[in-house]
């Protein structure tokens, strides 16, 4: 390994070890447990997977929590913590019974009360959860292991919602923790999942440690996407934050780490050429990028100026800057994912700088700076901000491109303050396509504004009416027609701009086997030689 790279890697490990008082050499010498050392796409600071849609929090959630239902590789919803369930003849009452042996990491049994409190909290934050709660009359405990969900009218997305595979996943927490206000981070990291969170070794943004949960009782079925048995085959998993990807790549090649969640695409040829390194596409559905404007702050509180922005940008520019390799990118302006039942290009804008300039004038743009937040430590998102800045400058907008780390962006995007008080105008993010397949699950289409909408707080009553219609419709052809109308309206009012679809594979050590296809990078079933 290059001396500078080795020094950088050792410095990262020393920083990660310093808080717990163990230098990396001593820690490695004493390490007897089978440990996977992984570099994830971002450091973990927010440990609550309900208050944020950030994928690092979702990934953390899959480590320590479990779910009532889960989606399998055939996109069918399967029981997970639930042993059995029934639906009344009028389709208004769902009855759920929990499996035997479910236990939280503090030793307490999982009860109906825990599940009810967790669903209520999730239902205040998540797009699909909010919609489910709109049609829910009550959630009631029958006994410690059985509870009911009663509806106002038949609603076909009950199990789909409870088995939602990605942000926000309806993870089950102890009742006392789930009663935390839905806009506050939970005070404890206690679940019933296959790993336990090692709080004493947690260094926010730097290092997270998980250990195998010896009390976890897996299901008997084979693992399939988010469903089935979650059998842990190692003792510990450590997430290390190594922001310099050259350092991380060299550490993987030299066997000092085992796993990189999101290696930059321009490093893939190097990794493929390295002896034994595996490039694993765990998410075959792929990922979609998103440009999100803030509807609360000028100038994007004006529809004409939002429309101008959509006409200024070009999706291919984003894909070229972000991915660059045609084998890993798919131009796609379908908001509900290309090559799916709801895919359509209806309403999609075509770049038109002259028209964008005219709309900017009609909208009364006053030349004030537009704050674009750019996460410099997240390779998959870092190139997007400069592309947007260049496009907006071409039509005459004054752009303030502000660099920060991803976790700072995740915190700041929740602020509804004016720009001069720490607010913002634009940020970019990305979603696994499992989150984007329909108008109910796609949070970019949530048009509730300040009353439960996604960051940017887009508000449109017409879209909300159509989302309700989609949720109640069971005919796939009619659902597709509604999705088409939703997309046309979403583009017309400037909900967001899709920056393209792509594949983001893992890079892993030859020592690891058993990596599963899943909606998130999961660590059960993985063995280390």
What spans do the regions from the language model cover?
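Surface-exposed binding/hinge segments that line
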Residues: 30-31, 97, 131-203
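N-terminal lobe/hinge region of extracytoplasmic solute-binding protein
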Residues: 39-89, 120, 190
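Periplasmic-binding protein-like
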Residues: 48, 296, 300-339, 383-384, ...
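Aromatic- and charge-enriched surface segment that lines or borders ligand/interaction sites
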Residues: 83-128, 142, 146-150, 251, ...
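Aromatic-rich, solvent-exposed beta-strand/loop patch
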Residues: 90, 105, 150-170, 190-244, ...
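Structural transition elements
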Residues: 195, 326-362, 376-383
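Long beta-strand-rich cores associated with HINT superfamily self-processing modules
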Residues: 202, 506-529
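Extracytoplasmic/peripheral linker and loop segments enriched in polar/acidic and small residues
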Residues: 400-411, 440-510
